[in-house]
């Protein structure tokens, strides 16, 4: 329930809040499934989601929507004109040591066809996939393990560009 935390972030004067669309699923994901993979969504409570997007905008916060790897990008279609960014998770959140999910490149490309805001990618981003992602339309790359695992941050960052 991301909406439970919005006011705390607003009090911190943040500029943007990205939150998972999976939190707005009308179907319940079985607990056993959550323990082995990230949540996905097929039926979204758009009424609640649009209410929360509007709430953030009334507080001058840019709303961004995060998609887990198994969530199809078309769930964004009803709200694309209401949000400022999309964050594509290219690994399953909460499970460390994963490899980059290659289908994320196609997901970015699909989103970019109809969305002109920021497209961010997080998870397994490194020097071998960064160019593919930016060519597909991503303009913000989040890369922690690759950078922090490097002995030379400057070179690692240069290789991402």
Residue ranges of model-derived segments:
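Catalytic cores of alpha/beta
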Residues: 1-12, 71-83, 125-141
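Structural preference for beta-strand elements that scaffold enzyme active sites
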Residues: 15-18, 60-66, 85-87, 118-120, ...
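Glycine-rich phosphate-binding active-site loops on the catalytic face of alpha/beta enzymes
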Residues: 17-26, 87-96, 136-157
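Glycine/Thr-rich beta-alpha phosphate-binding loop at enzyme active sites
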Residues: 34, 69-71, 75-109, 113, ...
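Alpha-helix-loop-beta-strand connector modules within alpha/beta enzyme cores
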Residues: 41, 52-66, 102-123, 159-161
């Amino acid at each position: 329930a991301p909406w439970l935390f919005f006011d705390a972030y607003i009090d911190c004067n943040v500029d943007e809040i990205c939150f998972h669309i999976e939190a707005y699923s009308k179907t319940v994901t079985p607990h056993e499934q959550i323990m082995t993979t990230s949540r996905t969504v097929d039926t979204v409570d758009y009424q609640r989601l649009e209410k929360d997007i509007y709430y953030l905008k009334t507080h001058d916060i840019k709303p961004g929507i995060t998609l887990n790897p198994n969530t199809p990008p078309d769930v964004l279609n009803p709200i694309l004109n209401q949000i400022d960014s999309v964050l594509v998770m290219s690994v399953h959140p909460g499970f460390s040591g994963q490899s980059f999910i290659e289908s994320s490149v196609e997901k970015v490309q699909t989103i970019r066809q109809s969305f002109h805001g920021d497209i961010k990618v997080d998870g397994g981003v490194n020097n071998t996939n960064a160019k593919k992602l930016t060519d597909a339309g991503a303009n913000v790359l989040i890369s922690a393990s690759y950078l922090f695992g490097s002995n030379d941050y400057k070179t690692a960052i240069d290789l991402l560009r």
